[in-house]
């Protein structure tokens, strides 16, 4: 019986988080030019790039800003004044998928549902479990 009560409490606490995540995804998908992919991510080009797009095995250089749905910024390469380089195969699935949709010089908004971001584990103190994340990503180069 005690386990049933604990499970009911846990379910009650997580349902609002999932509802908020769905609301943010649905709202983003309605923005002009936005595309909701089969995985559930929403992609919207802010600035079109030129040239080629990276593949899932590419190493890319980007600038980015990450926020929660309440607008709280949790990370920014712009604030550090330093772009980052990484293999697309080594980041959250939302980035692997979304950055492949970009061309060098482009800038896009990625709205990442929890299952394509950090899921139930969250990330450190700034990204809670089951958080929908919003990234503004600028693709600088493909290595």
Go through each PLM region and give its residues.
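Cross-family detector of peptidyl-prolyl cis-trans isomerase
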Residues: 2-143
């Amino acid at each position: 019986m005690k386990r049933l009560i604990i499970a009911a409490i846990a379910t009650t606490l997580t349902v609002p988080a999932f509802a908020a995540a769905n609301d943010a995804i649905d709202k983003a998908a309605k923005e002009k030019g936005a595309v909701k992919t089969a995985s559930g991510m929403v992609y919207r080009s802010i600035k079109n790039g030129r040239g080629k797009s990276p593949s899932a095995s590419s190493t890319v250089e980007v600038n980015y800003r990450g926020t929660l749905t309440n607008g709280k910024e949790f990370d920014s390469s712009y604030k550090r004044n330093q772009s980052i380089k990484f293999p697309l195969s080594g980041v959250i699935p939302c980035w692997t998928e979304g950055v492949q949709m970009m061309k060098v010089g482009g800038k896009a908004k990625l709205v990442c549902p929890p299952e394509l971001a950090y899921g139930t584990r969250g990330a450190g103190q700034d990204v809670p479990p089951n958080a929908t994340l919003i990234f503004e990503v600028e693709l600088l180069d493909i290595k």
